[in-house]
Design a protein with these regions (language model features):
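Entry/N-cap segments of selected transmembrane alpha helices
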Residues: 37-40, 113, 164-180, 230, ...
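Membrane-interfacial loop-to-helix junctions in multi-pass transporters
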Residues: 59-61, 105-106, 140-143, 167, ...
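Short, non-helical or kinked segments that cap or interrupt transmembrane helices
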Residues: 57-64, 79-92, 133-143, 188-194
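Hydrophobic residues within alpha-helical transmembrane segments
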Residues: 38, 68, 88, 114-117, ...
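Membrane-embedded hairpin module used as a gating/binding unit in multi-pass transport
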Residues: 44, 199, 203-249
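Membrane-embedded alpha-helical modules
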Residues: 102-214
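N-terminal signal-anchor module of multipass membrane proteins
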Residues: 2-82, 90-102
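Transmembrane alpha-helix interface/packing and boundary motifs in multi-pass membrane proteins
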Residues: 71-83, 180-184, 242-245
Length: 249
């Protein structure tokens, strides 16, 4: 346990040759590591907060469970495979269908729970039997199609958000592209982080950021928990979602 959070400095910690990779047990200088970590947090926010907002779940509860699952994952594999376990976009369609049928979050939680159990069983099978069978059942062309379909399904929500503030969206996108093209080294790799910062500053200048929620929010709070309510009729909509994380990971 003592060496889980210990990393060796990769080279001089400042430069990386083209194609060079920083291994899981290595790190760059702390400033560069913090920058890359901050960008990963920005990338995490997309799924961790957008999915509950679109499905009606509580974002703080989602953040709590993703944090717990990530911590457990890192402890189990002893940080050999550093990763963040966020919410999956694959659940948006079945949860939306359940909500449309007025079955409630408790029923949707049951579908998520069953899907999670099945995915855990797939993980056990991969651990003991390997992953060759996944490559046979789901070749790259199938995996790519599944991931692409998820992106296409999110297009309507992206367009809705774009219409809310098209100027901010364009400024952010332009900043991301320009930083990636014009700058080399670490700054070019942090184009997402830089683009989001520029877009946020622009939104503040335009008066598009509402800070009232910060003043109204409690300093300390607890997530809103829901007990699953069994409804086997919704399982045909949820069970296929198992294929999504298998294809993504």
């Amino acid at each position: 346990m003592s060496n889980i959070f210990q990393w060796q400095l990769h080279g001089d910690g400042k430069t990386l040759a083209p194609g060079e990779v920083v291994e899981p047990d290595e790190r760059l200088t702390w400033v560069r590591t913090a920058g890359i970590g901050a960008q990963h947090v920005i990338a995490m926010f997309g799924a961790t907060f957008l999915v509950p907002i679109l499905t009606g779940f509580d974002p703080s509860t989602t953040l709590f469970f993703t944090a717990m699952s990530t911590a457990l994952f890192l402890l189990i594999n002893r940080n050999v495979l550093p990763s963040y376990l966020g919410s999956s976009f694959g659940f948006i369609a079945p949860i939306t269908a359940v909500s449309t049928a007025n079955k409630g979050i408790a029923v949707a939680s049951f579908g998520i729970m069953v899907t999670g159990i099945l995915l855990a069983l797939v993980g056990v099978l991969v651990h003991y039997a390997g992953s060759k069978w996944i490559d046979i059942i789901m070749p790259p062309v199938v995996n790519g199609a599944i991931v692409a379909i998820i992106g296409f399904n999110l297009a309507p929500s992206v367009w809705t958000n774009f219409q809310a503030a098209p100027d901010t969206a364009l400024v952010t996108l332009l900043a991301v592209l320009l930083v990636a093209v014009l700058f080399k080294g670490l700054l070019g790799r942090l184009n997402i982080l830089v683009g989001v910062i520029i877009g946020y500053v622009y939104a503040c200048i335009r008066g598009q950021v509402d800070f009232s929620a910060i003043g109204d929010a409690a300093w300390i709070g607890f997530p809103k928990f829901h007990l699953p309510q069994a409804d086997f009729s919704i399982l045909p909509m949820f069970i296929p979602v198992v294929l999504v994380p298998v294809a993504e990971n």
